[in-house]
């Protein structure tokens, strides 16, 4: 059986190549709840895989495909995974360079049921997103 870390690795590879749909199919349960922090236009809760994928698709549209993610570290527990990711992005001459921490609660089917995203510089993320 595939570990949660392996599933996450496959999903991160998909998002790195811009395949948002594959990311969702690999990692997210149908009824996932994604918590996005901050004060930007996208801050809030996203309920369901379609809503979560729209959030991610919006980032790819915003950056016109210039969104890059690099996994730094993954910590796996019984039901949870914590992932630290270096994220860089560009849009309209502006750059974003942050470390994101994603906490994920996995369900019995091996997919994420709840997802929390945090940043080492939320103000920079909010400013970049708008």
What are these regions (language model features)?
Residues 45, 93-95, 123-129:
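A short, polar/proline- and glycine-enriched secondary-structure boundary/capping micro-motif
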Residues 78-82, 95, 105-113:
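Coil-to-beta-strand transition motifs
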Residues 101-126:
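Short beta-strand edge/turn micro-motifs at domain boundaries
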Residues 1-31, 62:
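Short acidic-aromatic low-complexity motifs
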Residues 69-74, 86-88, 99-105:
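Hydrophobic/aromatic beta-strand elements that line small-molecule binding cavities or substrate pockets
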Residues 28, 87-89, 119:
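Short beta-strand segments enriched in hydrophobic/aromatic residues
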Residues 22-79:
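A solvent-exposed, acidic/Ser-Thr-rich amphipathic alpha-helical stretch
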């Amino acid at each position: 059986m595939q570990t949660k870390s392996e599933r996450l690795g496959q999903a991160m590879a998909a998002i790195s190549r811009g395949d948002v749909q594959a990311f969702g199919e690999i990692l997210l349960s149908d009824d996932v709840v994604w918590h996005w922090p901050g004060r930007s236009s996208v801050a809030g809760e996203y309920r369901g895989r379609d809503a979560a994928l729209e959030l991610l698709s919006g980032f790819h549209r915003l950056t016109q495909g210039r969104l890059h993610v690099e996994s730094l570290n993954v910590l796996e527990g019984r039901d949870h995974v914590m992932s630290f990711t270096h994220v860089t992005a560009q849009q309209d001459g502006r750059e974003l360079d942050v470390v994101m921490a994603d906490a994920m609660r996995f369900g019995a089917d091996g997919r994420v049921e709840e997802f929390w995203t945090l940043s080492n510089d939320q103000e920079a993320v909010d400013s970049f997103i708008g």
